[in-house]
Amino acid sequence: MSGSKGNHFNPVAMAELGFNKTNVRDEKMTVTMEYDFPFDLRFRGWVSLYMKTQKNNKFLPQAATGVLMNSIYANQATDATSDAYSLQSEWKLLYNKVFGEKHGLTATGVFRTYQSESTSTSNSTYGNASANLSDPVIGSAVAGANSASNERRTVTLTGQVVYNYDSRYVLNGTINYEGNSSMGRNNRFATYPSCGLAWNIDREHFWSDGFHKVVNEAKVRASLAWTGKSPSGASDYYGAFQSMGTYVTNPAIYPSRMQLDKLKWESTREWDLGFDFRFFNRLNVTLDYYDKKTTDLLSRNVEISSTTGYAKLSWMNSGSLSNKGFEARFDYDVIKRGPWSLRVNANASRNINKVEVLPANYTQEKYT
């Protein structure tokens, strides 16, 4: 039995008259391409397309809820549809050449793109005359109607060169040029370089055979790199307006979100110094010291003074952090006999995090 004011719930009526149906359709297609050019050039590329459509139909019968017919939960019908697609591609050109037996050169150029779009609509009505009339079009009153759409694009261009001399010295350099539509229009593109070098000491002529039996491998490496981070979301930097009912007798809107044209990338600079050793063909030792500093930290939903006309910023660049420390790892092959092997490993680390510059809104935010 269903109560007149919704005090009771009728599971039988829900099972027989109510429904919640979802249909999902996914499609994915990928095309790859390969071609070997003259002069040691190789081309590799792929394009991938992904599409998804989802439809949801729901009906909440009044016979199950027992509410009055003027309630929003009386014969409530909902239809919702969403469509999304993404298109990705990667194009890579490689060059690999050995000169004079000791000089090796590898160059790589990569171009990546990503684009995604999605739309969704939903409408809900209530007060349908009968549980047999479950389409929202038949509803006597609108419970809600929503629609949304978003679009995002990214592009990355990467160039890398690696030089190897006699397997003793390795030098590499990389440049990343990135663009992201979620950034402010004044800082949509950024460039981040990196470089590194390595010295295989055990391949030097002064590394005697006797010493090589004790220290089988020895390498020194160093690197310096800059990287960037963009905000999540499709278009949070856009300004937005929202309805506020009426002003006097006319419809009214107000600015609800500030435009962020000057939003910047969160940038990180990191350098690393490392050592790799292998002793007696059993013990591997890896030592690393790193120093990292992050500036223009991205903070989300930052509260600001109400005198600005806004309650918060969707994103803000403020503050900086430093992170430095030391890591050590040891791997020892206890047993290496035919198909049997036993390895024991241990590691130790010390990490120091420090807030170099406090966020500008520190006194306004509630930190716990």
Segments (PLM) and residue ranges:
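Extracellular/periplasmic, surface-exposed regions of secreted and cell-surface proteins
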Residues: 1-60, 71-368
